[in-house]
Amino acid sequence: RTCIPIPPVCF
C-alpha cells in the first residue's frame, strides 16, 4: 500500500 517514485514500486 505504499508507493515510492524511484524505482516506481508499490507494495
Swiss-Prot record:
Taxonomic source organism: Hoplobatrachus occipitalis (African groove-crowned bullfrog)
Can you say what this protein is called?
Tigerinin-4O
Q: What does this protein do?
A: Stimulates insulin release from beta cells at a concentration of 1 uM and release of glucagon-like peptide 1 (GLP-1) from enteroendocrine cells at a concentration of 10 nM in vitro. Reduces secretion of interferon gamma from peritoneal cells in a mouse model. Has no inhibitory activity against Gram-positive bacterium B.megaterium Bm11 or Gram-negative bacterium E.coli ATCC 25922 at concentrations of up to 100 uM. Has no hemolytic activity against mouse erythrocytes.
Q: Which GO terms describe its cellular component?
A: extracellular region
State any GO BP term from the record.
Answer: defense response
The organism's superkingdom is given as: Eukaryota
- Where, subcellularly, is it found? Secreted
Which Cys residues form disulphide pairs?
Answer: 3-10
Tissue specificity, per the record, is: Expressed by the skin glands.
Question: Keywords in UniProt for this one?
Answer: Amphibian defense peptide, Disulfide bond, Secreted
| This protein's record includes keyword Secreted | yes
Subunit description: Homodimer; the relevance of this is unclear as other tigerinins do not form dimers and a synthetic peptide remained a monomer.
